[in-house]
Each structure stands twice: as C-alpha cells, then as structure tokens.
Amino acid sequence: MEVIWKFALQITDRQTVTMPVGAEILSVQDQAGGLQLWAIVVPEEERREKRVIEIVGTGNPMADVLAEGLSRFHLATVQARGGALVWHVFELL
C-alpha cells in the first residue's frame, strides 16, 4: 500500500535524502519555517536509495552539474518569510 511520507530538508546547497526505492516526490514547501519534501512511498519496501537534492536561492550561483555528469529536475520554488526568501529546489540525476 502506498502512503505519503514527509522528509525534512536542510537549507543547504546539496544534501542526500534516503527514501524507499521508487519513491515519487510530490512537492516541496515551507512548513513552520522549514523546508519539507513530500513523497509517495511503499513503506513495506525495505530497499533504500539516496536522492540528491539541491537548493539554490534566487540570485545565488548554481553548481555546474553538467561537469559532474548530472542533470537537474526542478521540484519546486518555495517562498518563505512572506516572499523575502525564495528557494529553487531540484533533484540531481
């Protein structure tokens, strides 16, 4: 049976989030001042995979992921503090 899990994100350039294999990322939003990622998962799936998440603030430089042999998939743009802070959240593939 599928369920939706929430994963807390750090506000940092790059991080790894461990999820059940096959998790489908739905959304990233600000919740109570912190970034949260929601994904559909199968809790009975014992295998885990590491998903690489990149967060870039508006106006900040972006890493050259092509030079690393990676690509970006946009997950969300999140505004916090009434729009004073804007983060663009990607999964690196």
Predicted region positions:
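N-terminal domain-onset segments
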Residues: 1-38, 43, 49-51, 61-71
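Helix-rich interaction surfaces within compact, conserved domain-sized segments
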Residues: 51-93
